[in-house]
């Protein structure tokens, strides 16, 4: 069995920007495709997303990345076995010749990497999660649902990028998703009753103008109660601050509250919020460059709150290893397009898990109908997944795939409240 053809075309993502769709065909006729996502708030150490520049699509075209797939990558992979993912990914890494896919583009390489894995699984007649994870792939991830959007994901006054609910008090994924959808709809009703805008942000959450960064939490608490659930027992709250986007004049600018704070003041603010509300997770609470601030945050909250590094670690095993040595954070967000290939993503997850760091599989704000990360989360036993609210098809595609997987995995395990015990 060998790879017979590799190709790519330019398609659209959920924000109306171009992205790369790759297709891999095997010698037995098996054909599979993948669509690459794209982020809005990105860490500066992420692998390079190759864009065309110029006036076409306001500089965001991806025809260069498409051509790299159709020419260089295709030539390098045709004839290779699809069943050795590490060799496939290493071949593309060597072909690129840089640390961050600065020549071929991570959007070209990742698309091919994903499509190869899909084609190999299909050829063997097994699900993708089983192909990548083997017999040990059995944990159905607990969702982190972004129901109020702010920051760079919305055109509103809220500084923090994501306000999420986590259905931790349920026994299976399907019931958790049901409860989350009910909270989401009750949240909409509350926002309407308060005359707030119920327009949606990039990830399907609501994007109202609110008076502070605490008010969204208060409204979510009301929505949980109105839906008939108990905050802290059945529904917990998670935040993605995306603090790198708030850096200003040596501090952090909170426009909605008309103040600039130091790292220590921001950490104290988080401590206060965690004392008042059932917050179990804070992502990117400090800037990717503020390692002293991260150290302080970890000392203050690391024993009781999940502290997730996204821009901080960018799914990079080398950077994560430095964080582990310095005792920074206790969890990592996993975004395959930050590092550029399936194999490198798996390497980072294994490093995190060996060192007691939790792993949260994640979408990007620019998504598609591709649900690869749903299978990937199960394959790697991540335990948690971020893929938006229960609205917008590119978000629900992942949830619907997880519902299918839960029905397939006979010995599947949904951790729920055990995540934070």
Swiss-Prot record:
Q: Which Pfam families match?
A: Enolase_C, Enolase_N
One GO MF annotation is: magnesium ion binding
CDD domains per UniProt: enolase
Question: Which spans of this chain does the record mark as coiled coil?
Answer: none
What keywords sit in the KW lines?
Answer: Cytoplasm, Glycolysis, Lyase, Magnesium, Metal-binding, Secreted
- Describe how the cofactor binds: Binds a second Mg(2+) ion via substrate during catalysis.
Spell out the Gene3D superfamilies in the cross-references.
Enolase-like C-terminal domain (3.20.20.120), Enolase-like, N-terminal domain (3.30.390.10)
Pathway named in the protein's UniProt entry: Carbohydrate degradation; glycolysis; pyruvate from D-glyceraldehyde 3-phosphate: step 4/5
Q: Which top EC class is named for this enzyme in its record?
A: lyase
InterPro entries referenced in this protein's UniProt entry, alphabetically: Enolase, Enolase-like_C_sf, Enolase-like_N, Enolase_C, Enolase_CS, Enolase_N
Q: Which GO terms describe its biological process?
A: glycolytic process
| Reactions catalysed according to its record | (2R)-2-phosphoglycerate = phosphoenolpyruvate + H2O
- Annotated residues for binding of (2R)-2-phosphoglycerate: 161, 335, 364-365, 386
- Binding-site residues, Mg(2+): 240, 283, 310
Name any GO cellular component annotation: cell surface
Enzyme Commission number(s) from the entry: 4.2.1.11
UniProt cofactor(s): Mg(2+)
Subcellular localization, as worded in the UniProt entry: Cytoplasm; Secreted; Cell surface
Active site per the UniProt annotation: 203, 335
Q: What does this protein do?
A: Catalyzes the reversible conversion of 2-phosphoglycerate (2-PG) into phosphoenolpyruvate (PEP). It is essential for the degradation of carbohydrates via glycolysis.
**Family membership noted in the UniProt record:** Belongs to the enolase family.
This chain's protein is named Enolase
Which organism's genome codes for this protein? Sulfurimonas denitrificans (strain ATCC 33889 / DSM 1251)
Name of the gene: eno
């Amino acid at each position: 069995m060998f790879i017979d053809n590799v190709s790519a075309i330019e398609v659209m993502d959920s924000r109306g920007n171009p992205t790369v769709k790759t297709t891999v065909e095997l010698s037995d006729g098996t054909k599979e495709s993948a669509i690459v996502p794209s982020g809005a708030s990105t860490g500066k150490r992420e692998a390079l997303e190759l864009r065309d520049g110029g006036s076409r699509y306001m500089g965001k075209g991806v025809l260069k990345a498409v051509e790299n797939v159709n020419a260089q990558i295709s030539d390098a992979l045709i004839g290779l076995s699809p069943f050795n993912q590490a060799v496939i990914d290493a071949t593309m890494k060597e072909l690129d010749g840089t640390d961050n896919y600065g020549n071929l583009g991570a959007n070209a390489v990742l698309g091919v990497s994903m499509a190869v894995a899909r084609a190999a699984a299909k050829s063997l007649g097994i699900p993708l999660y089983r192909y990548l994870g083997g017999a040990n792939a059995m944990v159905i991830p607990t969702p982190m649902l972004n129901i109020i959007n702010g920051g760079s994901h919305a055109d509103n006054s809220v500084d923090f990028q994501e306000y999420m609910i986590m259905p931790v008090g349920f026994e299976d994924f399907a019931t958790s998703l049901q409860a989350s959808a009910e909270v989401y709809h009750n949240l909409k009703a509350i926002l309407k009753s308060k005359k707030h805008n119920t327009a949606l942000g990039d990830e399907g959450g609501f994007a109202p103008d609110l008076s502070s960064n605490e008010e969204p939490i208060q409204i979510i608490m009301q929505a949980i109660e109105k839906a008939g659930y108990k905050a802290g027992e059945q529904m917990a709250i998670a935040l993605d601050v995306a603090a790198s986007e708030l850096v200003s004049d040596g501090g952090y600018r909170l426009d909605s509250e008309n103040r600039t704070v130091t790292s220590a003041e921001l950490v104290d603010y988080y401590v206060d919020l965690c004392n008042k509300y059932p917050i179990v997770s804070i992502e990117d609470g400090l800037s990717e460059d503020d390692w002293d601030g991260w150290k302080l945050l970890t000392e203050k909250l690391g024993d009781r709150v999940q502290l997730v590094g996204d821009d901080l670690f960018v799914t990079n095993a080398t950077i994560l290893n430095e964080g582990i040595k310095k005792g920074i954070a206790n969890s990592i967000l996993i975004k395959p397009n930050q590092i550029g290939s399936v194999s490198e993503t798996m390497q980072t997850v294994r490093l995190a898990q060996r060192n007691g760091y939790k792993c949260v599989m994640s979408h990007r704000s620019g998504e598609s109908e591709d649900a690869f990360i749903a299978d990937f989360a199960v394959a790697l036993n991540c335990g948690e997944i971020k893929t938006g609210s229960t609205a917008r098809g590119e978000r629900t595609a992942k949830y619907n795939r997880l519902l299918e997987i839960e029905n397939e995995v006979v010995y599947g395990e949904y951790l729920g409240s055990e995540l934070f015990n």
